[in-house]
A protein has these predicted regions:
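Beta-lactamase-like hydrolase cores
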Residues: 95-96
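Non-catalytic interaction-recognition regions
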Residues: 1-92, 102, 109-568
Length: 568
C-alpha cells in the first residue's frame, strides 16, 4: 500500500535541506479532516530558511508536483501544507489488500529476527494472582503481534520455581503433609503449609535451620527434596494451566529459575574475572553506586545464588540459545529496580552489545479491586480462576435474561466473559494502575471487549442476511465515498502501522483503541447508511466494506487473545 507519509517526505525532501526521515517525523495527522489527511508544519524550517512559515508553506505548495493518483489536492493553512489523499485510490488499495491477504491482512513477511517475550512467570506453590493475570495477557498479546509481524518469537514462562522458600515448604510437608488435601486444592493447601511452617520458623531457630538445610539439599540434588519439589511444581502447573487454558495462552518454554541454578556459577566467574564482584558483609555484590542504584547482590553470605543471579544466568543462556534481537520482560513495575540492576550488571558479562541493548522491561501497573489492592499476603485475595469463571457466569446471566434461546450459549459466554477480562487488561496505558470493576468490564456499549465482539457479530449478521459477499473485482469503489465509509477506510489503512506501534512503544493499548475506533466507526456507518435493499452497486460495496471491517476486527481481537462469539 502507498505510504503517504513517505510520499510527502520524498516530495518535500527534494525541495528543502532536510533528510526524508526527519521530515516524516514532523508530518502530522490533523484532527479536523477539513485540514486534510496529512499536514506538514513549516515552523522548523523557518529559522534556517529565514522566512515565515506561511511563506515557506506557500512556496512548497507551488513547487510540489502532486501525483493525482495519490493526492487530490494540497492547501496551505497558516504555516502548514495540508495534503488531501485521493480517497478512491486509498479505498481501492485497502480493500484490495484485504481481499488478497484475508486473515493475514496487516501481517508481514517472515523476518530474520528473534524476539523473546517473557510473561506470566508465576511462583510455584503460591497463588496465581491478578498481577500474574496481567502479565499473562499482556505478554501473550505481544507474542502474537510479534509473530504476526514476521518475527521469530519465543514465549517463555520464567517460572518462580526456586528459592529458599522451598526449603520451608519441604520441611512443612515433611511434618504435616498428610493433613492437607493437595490433590484437590494444591495451591491453597500449600500456602497453608507455608504459613504454618513460617510461623514455626519465627518461633524456633532450629526449624529455620532445618529449612535452610533442606534448601541446600535441594540445590545439591538430594532425591527426597527434589522429588517433593517436583510434586509441588507439577501440582502448581496443573492449577496454572486451568487459567492458561481458559485464556487460551501458550508458551514455547517453561524454563524457570531452577533451570538456571547450575548456570549461576558462570555468572559469578565472569563477574569475578572482570573485577566487578565486591565482598560486602560476606556477600558478593556488584556495586552500582555510580549508576545511582543500590548494589546488586550476586551471592549471599551462605554462598547461594539469588533471584538476580538466576536472571543473569538466563540472559547468558538466552543469548546463546536464541540469539535474541530483543528480549522483553513483561513484569509489574514493582520490579523496575530489579530489572535496571540486572540490565546494568549484564553489561559486565562479556556479551555482545546486541544482546544487552535488546533487553527491555515492559512494566505494567497494578490492578485494584474497588476495596484495595489484590495480593497474596494481604487478606483481600481474588483468585484468578474464580474471577474468570465469574466473568463467564455473569455473561451467561445476561444472555439468559436477554436472549435465552441463543445457540451455543455456554461457548459464547466463555468467549465474551474471558474476552472482556483480557480486553480490560490491555486497553489502557500499561503502566497505569487500574481498577477492576465489573460494570465497566462487561459493559456491552462501553469501550470494552464485548463491544468489539458485539459489532463483529453485527457485521456477521449483515453478511448472513445478505446471503453473499460480492467479489472484490466487481465492487464499484466510488460507491464508498460517504463520510462514514471513508472514516472506516482510513482506520483500516492504519492497521499495520498500529501493530508496529504496539511493538515499538510496547503498548497493547494502541491496538485496543484501534479496535474500539473501528467498531465505533462501523456502528456509525451502520446507523447512517442503508446496507441492504439499496441500489445493487451500493449494496455490494457496503457489504464488502462490512466484510472488511469484520475481518479486521477479528484479526485484531485475535492478536489480543480475544475470540469472537458467533452470536450476541
Ligand atoms: N516470579 C516473579 C513474580 O511472580 C516474576 C518473574 C519475572 N521475571 C524475571 N525474569 N525475573 O514476581
Amino acid at each position: 500500500m502507498i505510504n503517504y507519509k513517505e510520499q510527502i517526505a520524498k516530495q518535500i525532501g527534494s525541495l528543502v535541506e532536510m533528510p526524508d526521515n526527519e521530515i516524516e517525523k514532523f508530518i502530522e495527522i490533523p484532527n479536523n479532516t477539513e485540514n486534510g489527511d496529512y499536514a506538514f508544519p513549516c515552523f522548523k524550517l523557518s529559522k534556517t530558511l529565514k522566512k515565515s512559515p506561511q511563506i515557506i508553506a506557500q512556496e512548497l505548495k507551488e513547487k510540489i508536483q502532486i501525483d493525482t493518483e495519490i493526492f487530490n489536492k494540497i492547501e496551505v493553512v497558516g504555516g502548514y501544507v495540508n495534503f488531501f489523499i485521493n480517497t478512491n485510490s486509498l479505498t481501492k488499495q485497502v480493500l484490495q489488500e484485504i481481499d488478497q491477504k484475508r486473515e493475514k491482512y496487516g501481517a508481514e513477511e517472515q523476518k530474520n529476527k528473534n524476539i523473546i517475550v517473557e510473561y506470566s512467570s508465576p511462583n510455584i506453590a503460591k497463588e496465581f494472582h491478578i498481577g500474574h493475570l496481567r502479565t499473562t495477557v499482556i505478554g501473550s498479546a505481544f507474542y502474537k503481534v510479534y509473530k504476526f509481524l514476521g518475527y521469530n518469537t519465543i514465549g517463555i514462562n520464567h517460572l518462580g520455581d526456586y528459592g529458599t522458600q522451598f526449603g520451608k515448604m519441604i520441611e512443612g510437608y515433611k511434618r504435616w503433609g498428610t493433613e492437607y488435601n493437595l490433590e484437590e486444592n494444591p495451591i491453597e493447601e500449600l500456602t497453608k503449609i507455608y504459613i504454618r511452617i513460617n510461623d514455626l520458623c519465627k518461633k524456633d531457630e532450629n526449624v529455620l535451620e532445618l529449612c535452610r538445610e533442606n534448601f541446600k539439599k535441594l540445590e545439591d540434588g538430594d532425591t527426597y527434596c527434589v522429588e517433593l519439589w517436583n510434586k509441588f511444581k507439577d501440582l502448581s502447573l496443573k492449577e496454572f494451566y486451568k487459567t492458561y487454558d481458559l485464556l487460551g495462552v501458550k508458551f514455547d518454554s517453561l524454563t524457570g529459575e531452577a533451570f538456571y541454578q547450575d548456570k549461576t556459577q558462570e555468572v559469578i566467574d565472569i563477574l569475578e574475572k572482570n573485577g566487578k564482584l565486591v565482598e560486602s558483609q560476606g556477600a558478593k555484590i556488584v556495586d552500582l553506586e555510580d549508576k545511582g542504584m543500590p548494589p546488586c547482590i550476586i551471592c549471599k553470605s551462605n554462598g547461594s545464588s539469588i533471584y538476580a543471579t538466576r536472571d543473569l544466568a538466563a540472559i547468558l543462556y538466552r543469548a546463546r540459545t536464541y540469539d535474541f534481537d530483543k528480549c522483553i520482560y513483561v513484569v509489574a513495575y514493582e520490579q523496575n529496580l530489579h530489572f535496571k540492576q540486572i540490565f546494568e550488571v549484564a553489561k559486565y558479562l562479556d556479551l555482545d552489545k546486541k544482546y544487552t541493548d535488546g533487553l527491555k522491561h515492559v512494566a505494567y501497573g497494578m490492578t485494584r479491586v474497588p476495596s484495595g489492592r489484590m495480593s497474596t499476603r494481604e487478606g483481600n485475595v481474588v483468585k484468578v480462576n474464580d474471577l474468570l469463571n465469574e466473568a463467564i457466569q455473569r455473561v451467561l446471566e445476561i444472555i439468559n435474561e436477554k436472549n435465552p434461546d441463543m445457540e451455543d450459549k455456554e461457548e459464547n459466554a466463555k468467549k465474551i466473559g474471558i474476552g472482556a477480562v483480557i480486553f480490560n487488561n490491555l486497553c489502557s496505558t500499561l503502566i497505569k494502575d487500574q481498577i477492576f470493576d465489573w460494570n465497566t468490564v462487561l459493559n456491552f456499549n462501553g469501550e470494552t471487549g464485548p463491544y468489539i465482539q458485539y459489532i463483529y457479530v453485527r457485521t456477521k449478521s449483515v453478511l448472513e442476511k445478505a446471503g453473499y459477499i460480492p467479489e472484490f473485482s466487481h465492487i464499484d469503489i466510488s460507491k464508498l465515498q460517504d463520510k462514514e465509509s471513508q472514516k472506516i477506510i482510513k482506520i483500516l489503512y492504519q492497521f499495520n502501522n498500529i501493530l508496529n506501534q504496539v511493538i515499538e512503544k510496547n503498548e497493547t493499548s494502541f491496538l485496543a483503541r484501534f479496535l474500539i475506533e473501528l467498531a465505533q466507526s462501523y456502528s456509525n456507518f451502520y446507523n447512517e447508511n442503508k446496507i441492504l435493499g439499496e441500489d445493487k452497486e451500493i449494496q455490494d460495496a457496503r457489504i464488502y466494506l462490512t466484510y472488511a471491517v469484520g475481518n479486521v476486527l477479528k484479526i485484531g481481537a485475535g492478536l489480543l487473545g480475544i475470540e469472537m462469539p458467533n452470536k450476541m
